């Protein structure tokens, strides 16, 4: 990480070529370097080769995009809300020919968001259900930050938020970020999983600023960031395609989360939970 930071710093003064021994990945930047920063795999760095690079770069400082929000009202009067979120942006292109599909990150989570919306439209909840597809996650959780700072709802009315990001596998189970903060709800997930025998495991993980749940957590909203674990390691690269995803536990994860919301409804009648 220190070397990566050094490369960025040096590129403010002159072009930089950095030889790396890690996988090529791509990301979205919100600032434009003054000079090129070029990465070369160490496997070809020592070969006698010459190449020319023509780089054209433009920073669109005020690019406009949007969050997409949908709402299903509760089947009876209820002031509390369950929120499902997923970011629908990815990395786009690098030049004319290099395209980053973002199958797992995060077309898979966006698909599950739509699956949840379809389910709760057909099976209304005692809660209000809010669905948010965020833009700008890859650029630094921009869409979710904007929503929290300009929210059309009272955040204190959110009973729980479930953020769906990287949902395309599951052979090794799922991880629940923030589960160390919300032990009762994490135990409920495991209780449901043990009862229904859905997933290999539900891994506990502490808070992290790595997806759109983060800004909600900072405002005191109870939230989990759920992501799948499995053999597919294609992340922020050109190989993150639909064809590489197994979706082997997609239905089971849907079952788990739907049941989680339904069990929270039952908890509402218990004094200790309110």
Segments and roles (model prediction):
Residues 134-234:
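Metal-dependent peptidase/peptidase-like ectodomains
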Residues 12-15, 78-82, 125-129, 156-160, ...:
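Loop/turn elements at helix/coil->beta-strand transitions in domains of secreted/extracellular proteins
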Residues 114-121, 146, 191, 259-263:
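Short glycine/serine- and small hydrophobic-enriched flexible loop segments
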Residues 1, 19-22, 41, 72, ...:
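Active-site-proximal beta-strand/loop segments in catalytic clefts of secreted hydrolases
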Residues 20-102, 118, 122, 126:
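Soluble metallo-hydrolase cores and metallopeptidase-like ectodomains found primarily
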Residues 118, 233-274:
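His/Asp/Glu-rich mid-to-C-terminal helical/loop segments that flank catalytic regions of hydrolases
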Residues 1, 56-58, 96-106, 133, ...:
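Second-shell loop/turn segments in exported
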Residues 103-116:
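Active-site alpha-helical elements of protease catalytic centers
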């Amino acid at each position: 990480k220190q070397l990566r930071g050094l490369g960025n710093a040096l590129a403010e003064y002159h072009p930089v070529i950095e030889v790396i021994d890690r996988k090529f990945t791509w990301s979205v930047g919100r600032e434009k370097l003054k000079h090129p920063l070029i990465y070369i795999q160490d496997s070809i760095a020592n070969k006698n080769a010459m190449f020319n690079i023509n780089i054209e770069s433009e920073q669109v400082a005020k690019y406009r995009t949007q969050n997409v929000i949908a709402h299903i009202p509760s089947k009876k009067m209820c002031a509390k809300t369950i929120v499902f979120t997923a970011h629908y942006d990815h990395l786009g292109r690098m030049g004319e020919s290099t395209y980053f599909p973002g199958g797992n990150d995060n077309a898979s989570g966006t698909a599950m968001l739509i699956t949840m919306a379809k389910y709760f439209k057909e099976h209304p909840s005692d809660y209000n259900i809010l669905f948010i597809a965020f833009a700008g996650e890859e650029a630094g959780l921009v869409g979710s930050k904007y929503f929290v700072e300009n929210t059309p709802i009272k955040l204190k009315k959110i009973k729980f938020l479930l953020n769906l990001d990287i949902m395309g596998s599951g052979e090794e189970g799922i991880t629940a970020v923030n589960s160390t903060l919300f032990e009762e709800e994490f135990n409920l997930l495991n209780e449901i999983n043990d009862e229904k025998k859905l997933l290999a495991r539900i891994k506990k993980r502490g808070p992290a600023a790595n997806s759109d749940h983060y800004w909600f957590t900072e405002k005191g909203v109870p939230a989990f960031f759920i992501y799948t674990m499995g053999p597919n390691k294609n992340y922020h690269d050109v190989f993150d395609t639909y064809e590489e995803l197994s979706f082997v536990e997609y239905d089971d994860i849907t079952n788990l989360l739907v049941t989680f919301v339904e069990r929270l409804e039952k908890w509402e009648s218990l004094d200790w939970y309110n």
